[in-house]
């Protein structure tokens, strides 16, 4: 798994590449949780380069979303490949999280206004 993060227009874009599984889920959780602890409130998970996500990876998504909700933050998923989207659909996650086709659409999916 490779994780790159960029701050764009008040959003943290976390781009996952490769495979998220039990071998690296803990690292991913720590890195994303640290960003929320530092004050990030709008997080976009760009999954366009993600090849596979296991149940351990899905757990991380849930935990980060919960952490964000506790601080009035939001999580939006974007650019899911068909086979990754299927995993999220089967798990019921598509009914829990906003999903966008692009980063631009993800920005529009946030419910709260950006702080001024």
Swiss-Prot record:
Possible positive regulator of sigma-B activity. Non-phosphorylated BtrV binds to BtrW, preventing its association with an unknown partner(s) that might be sigma-B. When phosphorylated, releases BtrW, which is then free to complex with and inactivate its partner. Involved in type III secretion system (T3SS). Belongs to the anti-sigma-factor antagonist family. Residues 1-110 form the STAS domain. Interacts with BtrW. Phosphorylated by BtrW. Dephosphorylated by BtrU. Type III secreted proteins Bsp22 and BopD accumulate intracellularly instead of being secreted in cells expressing the mutagenized BtrV. The modification Phosphoserine is found at residue 55. Changing residue 55 to D: Absence of BtrW-catalyzed phosphorylation; binds BtrW 2-fold more than wild-type. It comes from Bordetella bronchiseptica (strain ATCC BAA-588 / NCTC 13252 / RB50). It holds the Pfam family STAS. It comes from the Bacteria. Keywords: Phosphoprotein. PANTHER family: ANTI-SIGMA FACTOR ANTAGONIST TM_1081-RELATED, ANTI-SIGMA FACTOR ANTAGONIST TM_1081-RELATED-RELATED. This is Putative anti-sigma factor antagonist BtrV. GO terms for molecular function: anti-sigma factor antagonist activity. The keyword Metal-binding does not apply. The keyword Phosphoprotein applies.
